[in-house]
UniProtKB/Swiss-Prot annotation:
Annotated Gene3D superfamilies: Aldolase class I
E.C. number(s) listed in UniProt: 5.3.1.1
Known catalytic reactions: D-glyceraldehyde 3-phosphate = dihydroxyacetone phosphate
Function: Involved in the gluconeogenesis. Catalyzes stereospecifically the conversion of dihydroxyacetone phosphate (DHAP) to D-glyceraldehyde-3-phosphate (G3P).
Subunit structure: Homodimer.
Protein name: Triosephosphate isomerase
Active site: H94, E165
Residues engaged in binding substrate: N8, W9, K10, G171, S210
Pfam families documented for this protein: TIM (PF00121)
Similarity section: Belongs to the triosephosphate isomerase family.
EC category name: isomerase
Lineage of the species this protein comes from: Bacteria, Pseudomonadati, Aquificota, Aquificia, Aquificales
GO molecular function, one term: triose-phosphate isomerase activity
GO biological process, one term: glyceraldehyde-3-phosphate biosynthetic process
Natural source organism: Aquifex aeolicus (strain VF5)
């Protein structure tokens, strides 16, 4: 599979700012078929982004979803709603959802199952906090997060991507080293192969956490890193383009 470079804008950009960004970013996009490019704007910008990205080769994704198709869930958004505006991907279990909004492994599991049932590709985010890393619990934390998220759907791992995002590196300007990332990515790959021996490398494992144009190339030198989930550095179209074409 092609390596995936994903932009997670988080709670940034109005509709007007989204239009300006995409108009600028598309000027930098050449041969998108050589890699998969994904932009995940806030919900209010999904419709206009979907229209502007049609036929460009750049994919559209959402930052979150609910596991039900419809109902009395004030403030939530369903997968069919996302698909109607062109979303092919959705980020599930981002550390900010886990730690700021209290999303549990059980809830994340429900979202993963719903994504698979409804035909949208989830990017499952996993990662350890600083104190867990210092206690030598990195692998245990990640194994638990992955196993709980994928319980009962292990045979469908080929339809899921995983983003390793060490919580201590997100938005701090202090990324994990490429060597740290490779070690964890290798662990995740081995775990996925244990859960589904037929996976055959179809689950891409991305790195996320203070990625920028200066360090992206160092991460992407390693075959164990199948892509990047980019936060702050994706908010500037030229900066994100440099990351996309850093390898």
């Amino acid at each position: 599979m092609r390596r995936l470079i994903a932009a997670n804008w988080k709670m940034n950009k109005t509709v007007k700012e989204t239009e300006e960004y995409i108009n600028t970013f598309l000027k930098f996009v050449e041969h998108p078929e050589s890699r998969e490019i994904l932009i995940c704007p806030p919900f209010t910008s999904l419709y206009v982004a979907g229209k502007m990205l049609q036929g460009t080769g750049v994919k559209l994704g959402a930052q979150n979803c609910h596991y039900e198709k419809r109902g009395a869930f004030t403030g939530e958004i369903s997968i069919p709603m996302l698909q109607e505006v062109g979303c092919e991907y959705v980020i599930v279990g981002h550390s900010e959802r886990r730690h700021i909004f209290g999303e549990s492994d059980e809830l994340i599991h429900k979202k993963i199952v719903a994504c698979l049932e409804m035909g949208i590709r989830p990017i499952l985010c996993v990662g350890e906090k600083k104190e867990e890393r210092e206690a030598g619990m990195t692998f245990k934390v990640i194994e638990t997060q992955i196993k709980l998220a994928l319980t009962g759907v292990e045979e469908h791992t080929d339809k899921i991507d995983i983003a390793y995002e060490p919580v201590w590196a997100i938005g701090t300007g202090t990324p994990a080293t490429p060597e740290d990332a490779v070690e964890v990515h290798t662990f995740i790959r081995n775990l996925i192969n244990q859960l589904n021996p037929k996976n055959e490398g179809k689950t891409r494992i991305l790195y996320g956490g203070s990625v920028n144009p200066q360090n992206a190339k160092e991460f992407m030198k390693h075959e164990e890193i199948n892509g990047l989930l980019v936060g702050t550095a994706s908010l500037d179209p030229e900066s994100f383009a440099k990351i996309v074409y850093s390898f």
